[in-house]
């Protein structure tokens, strides 16, 4: 994921920051507990495509 792109992308719901999970190929919004898929290097920022992250499991913001 291009670092410059990640700097400008925000959660479409809360407009908060996203964290890239390289292993899962997802952009994570910790505030809304949603994960947006990254397909073929392209972030899919549609709410209907997002999945709920596991409640109580913090996502590592470093993407590790």
From Swiss-Prot:
Cellular component annotations (GO), alphabetically ordered: cytosol
Gene3D superfamilies in alphabetical order: 2.20.25.10
Any Pfam family the entry gives: Trm112p
Record InterPro entries: Trm112-like
Cystine crosslinks: none
Signal peptide: none
Coiled coil regions in record: none
Family (UniProt): Belongs to the UPF0434 family.
Name of the molecule in the record: UPF0434 protein Bmul_0750/BMULJ_02510
Organism: Burkholderia multivorans (strain ATCC 17616 / 249)
């Amino acid at each position: 994921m291009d670092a410059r792109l990640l700097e400008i992308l925000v959660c479409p719901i809360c407009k908060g920051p996203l964290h890239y999970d390289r292993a899962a190929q997802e952009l994570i919004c910790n505030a809304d507990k949603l994960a947006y898929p990254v397909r073929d290097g392209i972030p899919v920022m549609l709410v209907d495509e997002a999945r709920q992250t596991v409640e109580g499991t913090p996502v590592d913001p470093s993407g590790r």
